[in-house]
Amino acid sequence: NTDTNCCFTIAQRAAQAIDEFPVLVLPPIWTGYSPHHMPHPGSITLKYHTFVELLTQVAVSVHAHGFKKILFLNGHAGNSPVIAAMRTKLAAEEGFSSLGYNYWDLPSVAEEIKKVSVSAKGFIGHSGEIETSLQLYLQPELVLMDVATWVPGVWGNPSTGNPEKGERII
């Protein structure tokens, strides 16, 4: 749940910091577009158009209840093109716009990643230094550092992760 957990925590913390208007943080959509991960056991993916439609219907529902500023905060790079397509679809077919960001591209998060990164050089990676650091801070019981190695499917060096880096990023 690394992608979901990191993204959801950042969304919740950001919402708590906003006083100017009400902010609704929906429960995360835990699956997305990941056909490139299917060779790795345990991966689950939606079809491209299924995921576009799921996101579209969530946005349409939220918009119907009066929320006019809709932000999709993403925690998985593979979802980025799908979110872009959904945003285009919303504008063309539903007549309203939304925003979509990867949490690691938010200015304060990106800046902190660059500062703390040893092996990743500011790159979020996949189960590498940054995601390992975030999980060590958020859910340390799920991280087994004694087996954290650079293996196929991992982009970045997880052994350089630590909870202090994760806390700074969050």
Give, region by region, the residue ranges found by the protein language model:
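Extended, histidine- and acidic-residue-enriched regions that form the cofactor-binding/catalytic faces
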Residues: 1-71, 75-170
